[in-house]
Amino acid sequence: MTTETFVKDIKPGLKNLNLIFIVLETGRVTKTKDGHEVRTCKVADKTGSINISVWDDVGNLIQPGDIIRLTKGYASVFKGCLTLYTGRGGDLQKIGEFCMVYSEVPNFSEPNPEYNTQQAPNKSVQNNDNSPTAPQATTGPPAASPASENQNGNGLSTQLGPVGGPHPSHTPSHPPSTRITRSQPNHTPSGPPGPSSNPVSNGKETRRSSKR
């Protein structure tokens, strides 16, 4: 025989749950993207109440006051609230109406901060695993980009500046060189007066020799 579980003993992640409960409320129908209809119902036994998610036609058949036996159900946290589901091969069977002792409190489907803290570390770990990679990816390109920009754009402009600077410096250097070339003729008469006197003396000698 299957052992029955009380609402107070339901924990997230439990499977193959067998319960007997009474339906207190039936919620609104919501449709999924696949076209399925989902209804959340509030059920209870003598230990407390909990929400159960029922799909499609079964949800339309359930009415408040029905006493139902759940077989092969499972529990999970949905939006921070503990919720019952019918698993694969699970079944909901109506076994009676109204005559059942139940307690609406405590409501185990109320938001529980413990469930949020259990889910938060997992999300934070995933964020931490992704965050280092993201900053590395962001810091890498910008670090390389400014360097490349400085080398390609600003670097070239700064290099062009000094390169342009030396050209004017070279241009004045060229005029002095031209002045030097001009000064060479000046220097040549001043420098070679000795040799010039020699040709003059040689010329006189030649003239004297010619006169002789």
UniProtKB/Swiss-Prot annotation:
Disulphide-bridged cysteine pairs: none
GO terms for biological process, alphabetical: DNA damage response; DNA repair; double-strand break repair via homologous recombination; establishment of protein localization to telomere; mitotic G2/M transition checkpoint; positive regulation of telomere capping; response to ionizing radiation
CDD domains reported for this sequence: SoSSB_OBF
Signal peptide: none
Post-translational modification: Phosphorylated by ATM in response to DNA damage. Phosphorylation prevents degradation by the proteasome, hence stabilization of the protein and accumulation within cells.
Entries under Gene3D superfamilies matching the protein: Nucleic acid-binding proteins
DNA-binding region: 22-92
Extent of Polar residues compositional bias: 114-130, 149-160
Repeat recorded as keyword: no
Residues modified to Phosphothreonine: T117
Extent of Low complexity compositional bias: 131-148, 166-178
Disordered: region residues: 110-212
A GO CC term assigned to this protein in UniProt: cytosol
Record InterPro entries: NA-bd_OB-fold, SOSS-B, Ssb-like_OB
Keywords of this entry: DNA damage, DNA repair, DNA-binding, Nucleus, Phosphoprotein, Ubl conjugation
A GO molecular-function descriptor: DNA polymerase binding
Cell compartment(s), UniProt: Nucleus
Function: Component of the SOSS complex, a multiprotein complex that functions downstream of the MRN complex to promote DNA repair and G2/M checkpoint. In the SOSS complex, acts as a sensor of single-stranded DNA that binds to single-stranded DNA, in particular to polypyrimidines. The SOSS complex associates with DNA lesions and influences diverse endpoints in the cellular DNA damage response including cell-cycle checkpoint activation, recombinational repair and maintenance of genomic stability.
Family the entry assigns: Belongs to the SOSS-B family. SOSS-B1 subfamily.
Known partners and oligomeric status: Component of the SOSS complex, composed of SOSS-B (SOSS-B1/NABP2 or SOSS-B2/NABP1), SOSS-A/INTS3 and SOSS-C/INIP. SOSS complexes containing SOSS-B1/NABP2 are more abundant than complexes containing SOSS-B2/NABP1. Directly interacts with ATM, SOSS-A/INTS3 and RAD51. Interacts with INTS7.
Protein name, UniProt field: SOSS complex subunit B1
Organism (species): Mus musculus (Mouse)
Gene giving rise to this polypeptide: Nabp2
